[in-house]
Amino acid sequence: KALGCGVPVGAFLMTQRVADKSLAPGDHGTTYGGNPFVGAAVSAVFDEFKRLDIVSHVKDVAPYLEKKLDELVAKFDCLTARRGMGLMQGVECSLPVGKVSAEALNQGLIVITAGSNVLRFVPPLVIE
């Protein structure tokens, strides 16, 4: 979620077994691969994640978000399911999510959409 903390960066992980069956040298590349600036940014982010013990913090606070979203799903017929992991959550909605997202913003809540029927809730990893 916050791999670069604002610096554009992407990554993926796979087991060696999957890599051996999926990739050969040269199969995966990028224009900016090996960029030292991005590498330094990611390294600094990881250092801060360790210093602040972000993973433990997310494990502590995520159940609260999950519980509150589950309560909303139970309360409103237009919300049909919650899905996600940790602090990356989505709620399926039977209403046009663009309109719901716009009204949420009018009420002071930033909610983004994912596809045509999901409201995404992605708070900062340092949320209390």
What is the meaning of each model-derived region?
Residues 1-128:
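Conserved N-terminal phosphate-binding loop of PLP-dependent enzymes in the Aspartate aminotransferase
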